[in-house]
Amino acid sequence: EVSRALGVLSNKTPAALKVAVNTTARQTRKLMLTEVKNRYDLNAAGRRMIEDLRQRQRATNRHPTAILAIMKNDPGAFRADLGYFRTSPTKPFMGPSVRNAPPVFQAHVLKDSPMIGLSGTGERSKGFLVQFKSKHIGMVQRQLGVPADKDYTESGKERWKPNEKLVTMSSPSGSAMHHTVWEMQETTVEQMLQDNTERRIRQLIANAKRKGVI
């Protein structure tokens, strides 16, 4: 179809497709990031995490295929914790400041969903924020009755008793969020590719006419 539209310039088909596909890939990344931010109530760390979506393969004349992906070793490939989303309060209460913590932390994932109190279950404690050695702030729960692996903090202080194992409160990973949004925007991207291809065809024909080739 592209070759037919180009007519005597049909030899430009691979180059036309390459430009159209790479343009669409760049536009798609921007679209995906915007839609993820519109759908999910991410905090600053969460917004950085979803930026792992990048163009991993550029289209060429020989292979007119571009790939957008979060790679398996990127932070965004792993199941995220609730600490990447909106929480109330937004800061951890650790050490002596624990006495100032609210009775229950609240959080949600989707912007159009209500904040939910993280009151815990029979096997797990209430959810609360902690800052890890890596400086990441995550939402965790204590696994009641299961002893922690370490009895001392990184600074060498003995942990309070009972010292129970911490587990992360999970939420969608960057990959999962982009996958959900892709299913919602696939038709839009197909139209973008068609528009970019037609635009590139018009440009090539106009350039050829200006040079007197056709």
Tell where the protein language model's regions lie, with residue ranges:
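Short, Lys/Arg-rich flexible segments
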Residues: E1-I214
